[in-house]
């Protein structure tokens, strides 16, 4: 890989964001001589992005920090189809109302990372439904479809692997890569965008856009993809044992978000500090030198910095303090997740097994049972080893709540109503 002249590509390289670039010399020269507008597309198939999207959001963050213009593309049009890249089956089709509602919720996250406005490097959020939903199908086939080879499209890994596993690929989904390529050209026409970024699974789709632009007479367009990250143990980023690590606070509490990053494996701490925080590299190198139990301090800094970017510094510090009190002082922190229960249920007693599942601490009764038998469940910091144990009114403490603990790191406050 080249030693880059431009600040943006230097940061991308130094921090580990780069998987592939379509033309390293050409892109570096472009970034060195002018303000570059670039974009990443986000799929609005849920009402929140999850932590797997943070890598791309940080790429946009650094793009703006180094004096360039990041564009957020919401797939309001392509979302009606769903990206088939490396999926074994078709996604559930959403309505336009579903997607519009999801986009409204997702937009809030980007304001934490990007500056929006009318200045040259200010960001904006664009919805590809603006042009895709008004296309004339016959004109599109004639003017755009003629530039795509089905033979070549079938050779892309995202399609080939699915067909080799004998999973069907609908004509609807097959059109996705054509629409994404068209997005790139349309965004150049409307906003002067010269580069698309994305995960490495999007390489084929982005290259399609570059080639379409060449055939339609645009200036040279560029691709930059990031690696598809997993943890050192092979787990997919953005997923936990309890499901997706959502970015919206109404879908995952800031405390749970902080805790996800606090539980980072030792081998991943330095890599994640580079990718997910704006900390200077010299500070990251100092933290990476920590060994043994000292690495836990680096994990706390990692969790707090990532949470601060998403939820604000004050709240990040508050949840870090909650964690400290919970784990080090065994007291109740203000930001622990809460689960509300009918107070009448406690008069007769509620089964501990059921409550562990309902409160989201355990995925199943059998998992809860194993933890109880192993001494891993506590009620108000007292170990409970009886799987038939009932939670009753007398368990309510002076603060009017009941603290449930599942293992060392998962806690919920039960609040009777």
UniProtKB/Swiss-Prot annotation:
InterPro entries: aa-tRNA-synth_Ic, Rossmann-like_a/b/a_fold, S4_RNA-bd_sf, SYY-like_C, Tyr-tRNA-ligase, Tyr-tRNA-ligase_bac-type, Tyr-tRNA-ligase_bac_1. It catalyses: tRNA(Tyr) + L-tyrosine + ATP = L-tyrosyl-tRNA(Tyr) + AMP + diphosphate + H(+). Transmembrane segments: none annotated. SUPFAM superfamilies: Alpha-L RNA-binding motif, Nucleotidylyl transferase. GO terms for biological process: tyrosyl-tRNA aminoacylation. Signal peptide: none annotated. Residues 350-417 form the S4 RNA-binding domain. GO terms for molecular function: ATP binding; RNA binding; tyrosine-tRNA ligase activity. The keyword Translocase does not apply. A motif ('HIGH' region) lies at residues 44-53. Belongs to the class-I aminoacyl-tRNA synthetase family. TyrS type 1 subfamily. Catalyzes the attachment of tyrosine to tRNA(Tyr) in a two-step reaction: tyrosine is first activated by ATP to form Tyr-AMP and then transferred to the acceptor end of tRNA(Tyr). Homodimer. This is Tyrosine--tRNA ligase. It comes from Bartonella henselae (strain ATCC 49882 / DSM 28221 / CCUG 30454 / Houston 1) (Rochalimaea henselae). The lineage of its organism: Bacteria, Pseudomonadati, Pseudomonadota, Alphaproteobacteria, Hyphomicrobiales.
């Amino acid at each position: 890989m080249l030693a880059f002249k431009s600040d943006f590509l230097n940061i991308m390289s130094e921090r580990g964001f780069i998987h592939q670039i379509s033309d390293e010399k050409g892109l570096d020269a472009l970034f060195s001589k002018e303000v570059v507008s670039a974009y990443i597309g986000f799929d609005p198939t849920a009402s929140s992005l999850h932590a797997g999207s943070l890598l791309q959001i940080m790429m946009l963050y650094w793009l703006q920090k180094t004096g360039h213009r990041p564009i957020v593309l919401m797939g309001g049009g392509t979302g009606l189809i769903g990206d088939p890249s490396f999926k074994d089956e078709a996604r559930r089709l959403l309505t336009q109302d579903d997607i519009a509602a999801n986009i409204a919720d997702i937009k809030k996250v980007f304001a934490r990372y990007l500056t929006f406005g009318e200045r040259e490097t200010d960001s904006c959020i664009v919805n590809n439904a603006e042009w895709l939903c008004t296309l004339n199908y016959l004109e599109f086939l004639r003017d755009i479809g003629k530039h795509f080879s089905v033979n070549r499209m079938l050779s892309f890994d995202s399609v080939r692997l699915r067909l080799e596993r004998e999973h069907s690929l609908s004509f609807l989904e097959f059109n996705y890569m054509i629409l994404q390529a068209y997005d790139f050209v349309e965004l150049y026409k409307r906003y002067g965008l010269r580069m698309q970024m994305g995960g490495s699974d999007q390489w084929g789709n982005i290259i399609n856009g570059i080639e379409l632009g060449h055939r339609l007479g645009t200036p040279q367009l560029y691709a930059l993809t990031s690696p598809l990250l997993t943890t050192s143990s092979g787990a997919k980023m953005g997923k936990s044992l309890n499901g997706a690590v959502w970015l919206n606070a109404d879908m995952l509490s800031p405390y749970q978000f902080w805790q996800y990053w606090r539980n980072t494996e030792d081998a991943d701490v330095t890599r994640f500090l580079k990718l997910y925080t704006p900390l200077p590299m010299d500070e990251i190198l100092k933290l990476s030198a920590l060994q043994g139990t000292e690495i836990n301090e680096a994990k706390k800094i990692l969790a707090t910095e990532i949470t601060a970017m998403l939820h604000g510094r004050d709240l990040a510090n508050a949840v870090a303090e909650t964690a400290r009190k919970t784990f080090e002082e065994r007291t109740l922190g203000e930001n622990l997740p809460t689960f509300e229960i009918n107070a009448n249920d406690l008069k007769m007693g509620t089964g501990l097994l059921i409550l562990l599942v309902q409160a989201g601490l355990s995925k199943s009764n059998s998992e809860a049972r194993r933890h109880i038998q192993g001494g891993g469940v506590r009620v108000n910091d007292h170990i409970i080893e009886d799987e038939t144990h009932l939670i009753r009114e007398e368990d309510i403490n002076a603060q009017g709540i009941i603290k449930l603990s599942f293992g060392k790191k998962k806690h919920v406050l039960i609040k009777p109503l």
